[in-house]
Amino acid sequence: MNFWAAFSACLVGYLVYSGRLNGELQEIKSILIIAYEAADKRYRGVIDEIESLKTDTFMMLSNLQNNTIRTWDAVAKNGKKIANLDERVNGLLAKHAVPALVR
């Protein structure tokens, strides 16, 4: 056995002999509980932040989708108007313009 294993065995034997092993285990347990509660608090904080960011992201994506739909509708509507105006201008040019201007 190496030195640390022998030392640990002697320490545990002493603690059992003196009746302090239970007290030491309770102290270790309380330290572990405190560490767990701190880690759990941080974990819950991170989860809450992720939930908040997820909600904000979904709202922004929804707004982006709505804006994109409105933009495409406006482009389609204006495209039809421009095509209609182009046809009218071509018709007027064909009737009244100089033949060199008409293709």
From Swiss-Prot:
Domain of life: Viruses
Keyword vocabulary terms for this entry: Late protein
Record's protein name: GP16 protein
Gene behind this protein: GP16
